[in-house]
């Protein structure tokens, strides 16, 4: 009977797991002879307030802008942009124009009932109609306005000297202040590297 019981027993549905060998790589925690030789013996520490920054005259002076966009040209572009939007069935009025070093921001206040997604979807058509490489369209947070950024024909060079010489830089309290450039409105932009996630 025991032979019949063995024949009637069904084979297991799951094959037994085979024990695999796990090979971990060795961590490179040990220092080699070269690393010991080149290790810094000590860190020179300056007394607080004893370090002086290099003078600003080591950096190039900002050149006078050869071409400044006139208020008339900005007004004409704003009217042209309103006409382009009207051609696509978008009613609204441009309230503010903010020329920056690289792009100019046109703030459009859409008429009642105009969806912002409709205007945002027209960004490629706006760029083509305004003879621009690209147009960036986004809602201005906290206001009933849509920002339309169009690139300037002549980009303004931003010099490190004018950023480091700005009053805003002197007023920063960061330990590692970085000069990033200028905002769309032409104001200097700084950030504290010590406060950034890392």
Across the structure, where does each feature detected by a protein language model lie?
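Low-complexity, intrinsically disordered P/S/T-rich segments
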Residues: 1-198
């Amino acid at each position: 009977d025991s032979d019949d019981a063995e024949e009637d027993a069904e084979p297991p549905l799951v094959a037994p797991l085979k024990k695999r060998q796990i090979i971990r790589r060795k961590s490179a925690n040990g220092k080699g002879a070269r690393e010991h030789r080149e290790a810094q013996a000590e860190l020179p520490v300056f007394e607080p307030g004893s370090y002086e920054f290099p003078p600003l005259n080591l950096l190039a002076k900002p050149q006078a802008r050869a071409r400044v966009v006139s208020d008339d040209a900005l007004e004409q572009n704003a009217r042209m942009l309103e006409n382009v939007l009207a051609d696509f069935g978008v009613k609204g009025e441009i309230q503010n124009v903010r020329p920056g070093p690289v792009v100019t921001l046109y703030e459009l206040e859409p008429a009642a009932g105009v969806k912002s997604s409709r205007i945002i979807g027209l960004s490629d058509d706006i760029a083509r109609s305004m003879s621009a490489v690209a147009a960036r369209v986004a809602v201005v947070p906290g206001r009933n306005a849509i920002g339309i950024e169009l690139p300037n024909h002549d980009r303004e060079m931003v010099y490190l000297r004018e950023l480091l010489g700005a009053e805003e830089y002197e007023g920063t309290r960061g330990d590692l202040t970085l000069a990033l450039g200028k905002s769309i409105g032409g104001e200097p932009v700084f950030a504290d590297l010590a406060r950034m996630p890392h």
